[in-house]
Each structure stands twice: as structure tokens, then as C-alpha cells.
Amino acid sequence: MIKLFTLKQQKKDGEQKGSQQKKASAAQLRIQKDINELNLPNTCATDFPDPNDLLNFKLIISPDEGFYRDGRFVFNFRVGSNYPHEPPKVKCATQVYHPNIDLDGNVCLNILREDWNPVLNINSIVYGLQFLFLEPNPEDPLNKEAADVLQTNRRQFENNVKKAMRGGCVGETYFECCLLK
């Protein structure tokens, strides 16, 4: 009787593990599809530190115009097992003076929050992030100080961005150099 109970429990445990693996498999299949369909602009590149782990990767954006021209910004992507029903977690690893990216690397992009839906993909996020560098949005800021400066004194904002990208202090915050050249 005890052996029968043990066998039933093992079977149940095996089924639960199988269903968990199916969820991960669905996320892996979808991310594989998204990566195969990536159409990166020449200002973006991906890096997979572990080629066997497609759920964790880096996106490097190097804008060729706008305030952030000639900068190099690295974003870490962490894709969860509920992808595409939940968006990936995206953080900026490069500290940047930007209204929509806070000093901890959190990114304010609507499709990473309330506007996410399963028909969106990694390509959508790449273009959204790239757009943030071309057109920072002071109306929906994470870095309120940068947003205020952008709204009230565009020239000062541009100077602050350049100073931060060269490696310097803006206010009390020191930024590492992130220039390509």
C-alpha cells in the first residue's frame, strides 16, 4: 500500500514537472522565433553571453543621431516562463542621464508595462528602446530631474547628456563614459 502511494506521488510529481517544462518550452519556442525574426537596425546588436540560454541576453544600442549620438547603451533582457503573455524584464546596464531611464536602470516604456500584449515581440521592444533615445519623453518620466530640464531648457539638457556620456557629474550623480569614439 505504501509503495502504491509512493508510485502515485512520483507520477504526480513527474506530471507537475512536465507541465512546468511545457511552459518554459513555450517561452523558449517563442523567443527562438522572435530572435530568428529580429530585424535589427545598424545601430543595434545583440549579445548572448550563454548561447544555450536564449532567455537572457543583452541588447546594445548605439544611436547615430539625437542627444545620445555616439553613445553605447547596454540593456539586459530576462525572458520569463510566461513569455509572451508577460513582457520580458528589461534593465539598462549603462547608467544614463535620461528622462525615461532611472539611475537604477529601470526603463519607462509603455509596451514593457500596461500596453504589453502577446502579439508584441522582441523586435517591438528594440524599436521602442531605440525611439526613447531619439525622442526622450518628458511626459512620462522615471528621472524627473532630467525630464524637467528637457522641458524647460533643451540646451542645458543636451549639455547634461554630453557631460554624462563623456564621464562626468550631473548634479550629484557621476556617470561612467559611454561614448564609442
Swiss-Prot record:
Expressed in the wing disk. The keyword Transmembrane does not apply. Its EC number is 2.3.2.34. The active site is at residue 108. Disulfide bonds: none annotated. One of its GO terms (molecular function) is NEDD8 conjugating enzyme activity. Pathway: Protein modification; protein neddylation. Residues 4-7, 24-54 are annotated as: Interaction with Uba3. CDD domains: UBCc_UBE2F_UBE2M. InterPro entries: Ub_conjugating_enzyme (IPR050113), UBQ-conjugat_E2_core (IPR000608), UBQ-conjugating_AS (IPR023313), UBQ-conjugating_enzyme/RWD (IPR016135). It is an enzyme of class 2 (transferase). Transmembrane segments: none annotated. Keywords: ATP-binding, Nucleotide-binding, Transferase, Ubl conjugation pathway. It catalyses: [E1 NEDD8-activating enzyme]-S-[NEDD8 protein]-yl-L-cysteine + [E2 NEDD8-conjugating enzyme]-L-cysteine = [E1 NEDD8-activating enzyme]-L-cysteine + [E2 NEDD8-conjugating enzyme]-S-[NEDD8-protein]-yl-L-cysteine. GO terms for biological process: negative regulation of smoothened signaling pathway; positive regulation of peptidoglycan recognition protein signaling pathway; protein modification process; protein neddylation. SMART domains: UBCc. Interacts with Uba3. PANTHER family: UBIQUITIN-CONJUGATING ENZYME E2. Belongs to the ubiquitin-conjugating enzyme family. UBC12 subfamily. Accepts the ubiquitin-like protein Nedd8 from the Uba3-APP-BP1 E1 complex and catalyzes its covalent attachment to other proteins. Required for Cul1 and Cul3 neddylation. Negatively regulates full-length ci stability and hedgehog signaling. Both the N-terminal docking peptide and the catalytic core domain must bind the Uba3-Ula1 complex simultaneously for optimal transfer of Nedd8. This is Nedd8-conjugating enzyme UbcE2M. It comes from Drosophila melanogaster.
